[in-house]
């Protein structure tokens, strides 16, 4: 499965409430970098990164908009929607190797 195929399955599972299924698409050594303001936080390993998605509010949706397929890298403008919160556009980059997500980078637009 290529990056685009893997990410389509990831977003489908995440947005239909199958968070565990979405997390199963992550490599054991996945890393995620989240940018907030002038700061960034890095999570390492499927326990930390997967846990971030598993603990997110019920109803979290991440909807990819403009997608750029760069081989093993999938980049997209992602609309994030959470109940009771303002929606947010993120610049998102996902690296996929052998059908597993190995790296995630999320930054506000």
Go through each PLM region and give its residues.
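C-terminal and inter-domain tail/linker signature
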Residues: 1-109
């Amino acid at each position: 499965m290529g990056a685009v195929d893997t990410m389509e399955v990831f977003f489908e599972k995440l947005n239909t409430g199958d968070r565990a299924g979405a997390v199963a698409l992550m490599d054991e050594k996945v890393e995620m970098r989240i940018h907030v303001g002038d700061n960034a936080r890095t999570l390492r390993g499927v326990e930390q990164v997967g846990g971030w998605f598993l603990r997110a509010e019920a109803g979290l949706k991440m909807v990819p908009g403009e997608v750029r397929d760069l081989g093993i890298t999938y980049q997209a403008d992602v609309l994030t929607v959470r109940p009771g919160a303002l929606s947010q556009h993120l610049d998102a980059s996902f690296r996929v190797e052998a059908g597993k997500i190995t790296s995630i980078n999320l930054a506000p637009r």
